Amino acid sequence: MLRIVVDTNVVVSALLKPQSNPALTLSLFIQGDCTVCLSKEIFTEYEEVLARDRFKGLDEAEVKKLLSIFTRRALWVVPKVLIYDVAKEPADNAFLECALEAKADFLITGNIHHFPVKEFHHTHIVTPSEFLNLMIQLMIK
């Protein structure tokens, strides 16, 4: 099963726009078609960002439900290698650390420009749209 790491912006976008590519990406995880890989640092970022005032309009029950699904069904890892200088935003290095430890196939982000490389130790860095297109191609084969 494909292993994916999901950037916080994808989670937020999925909750804001339930018919969007980020939402479709998360639905693949929820349906069991891929495995989301998480570290404590990433999950904490999810919680902190979703608790911000500007996201108070989100359906609180949906937020709790999604976080609960992550808690129960994700592949949890503790990164052994710390990365300091790959992503343009220092906080984004946590996603690379998780991907490296989990041997993830994809890191999915809406902020592709934060990652100056398209691949990091065999993890492909893609947008939700690119990921969905790749999944469609895999299903056709």
Question: Model-derived features: where do they sit?
Answer:
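Metal-dependent nucleic-acid phosphoesterase active-site entry motif
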Residues: 1-19
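PIN/NYN-family metal-dependent endoribonuclease catalytic core
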Residues: 6, 22-51
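A secondary-structure boundary/capping signal
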Residues: 7-8, 38-39, 111, 127-128
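Active-site neighborhoods of divalent-metal-dependent phosphate/nucleic-acid chemistry enzymes
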Residues: 72-112
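Acidic, PIN/NYN-like endoribonuclease modules and their adjacent C-terminal/linker elements
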Residues: 86, 100, 105, 112-141
